Amino acid sequence: MGDIIELEGHLTVDGKKFCLLLSRFNSFITERLLEGAIDCIVRHGGKREDITVARVPGAFELPLVAQKAAKSGKYDGIVCLGAVIRGSTPHFDYVSSEVTKGVASISLAYDMPIGFGVLTTDTVEQAIDRAGTKAGNKGWEATISVIEMINLLDGM
């Protein structure tokens, strides 16, 4: 028996193009997620001119624009950023579920790494914590996952 082949994505960006999709709803949170995503790309060797930011009205619109970006062939990776905060109606459940399913299906359909940086929280405080304060920045975390997956898929 031969040696085992191990594949692992590296955390470097070399000439890769990114599309960052940002929900404008809850922008006081999502703009912080965007800052984290851009910082992550730049700190890992990416150039600001290789980043496209597209703003959509709300999280529900993210899958459609992610599909358009994936279909365009212009990008190596996509990161979806948003904040869905639970209210007193079932709207939260419908939106968070459909956004999650939509983003996952597009990633699979186009063999495209898509980072899921959509916060789904019970409170505004939880969202703020995850947008760069107590619980890190989920925009950064979604982006580092995309960087790793781009490099892993390139090696396959």
Curated annotation (Swiss-Prot):
Residues holding (2S)-2-hydroxy-3-oxobutyl phosphate: 88-89, 130
One Gene Ontology biological process: riboflavin biosynthetic process
Key words of the record: Riboflavin biosynthesis, Transferase
Pfam families: DMRL_synthase (PF00885)
Catalytic activity: (2S)-2-hydroxy-3-oxobutyl phosphate + 5-amino-6-(D-ribitylamino)uracil = 6,7-dimethyl-8-(1-D-ribityl)lumazine + phosphate + 2 H2O + H(+)
EC number(s) from the headed UniProt entry: 2.5.1.78
Catalytic residues as annotated in Swiss-Prot or TrEMBL: 91
Annotated InterPro entries: LS, LS/RS, LS/RS_sf
Entry GO MF terms: 6,7-dimethyl-8-ribityllumazine synthase activity
Pathway assigned to this chain's UniProt record: Cofactor biosynthesis; riboflavin biosynthesis; riboflavin from 2-hydroxy-3-oxobutyl phosphate and 5-amino-6-(D-ribitylamino)uracil: step 1/2
Gene3D superfamilies: Lumazine/riboflavin synthase
Residues holding 5-amino-6-(D-ribitylamino)uracil: 25, 59-61, 83-85, 116
Top EC class for this record: transferase
Gene Ontology CC annotations of this record: cytosol; riboflavin synthase complex
Family designation: Belongs to the DMRL synthase family.
Function, as annotated: Catalyzes the formation of 6,7-dimethyl-8-ribityllumazine by condensation of 5-amino-6-(D-ribitylamino)uracil with 3,4-dihydroxy-2-butanone 4-phosphate. This is the penultimate step in the biosynthesis of riboflavin.
Record's protein name: 6,7-dimethyl-8-ribityllumazine synthase
UniProt organism field: Magnetococcus marinus (strain ATCC BAA-1437 / JCM 17883 / MC-1)
Gene designation per UniProt: ribH
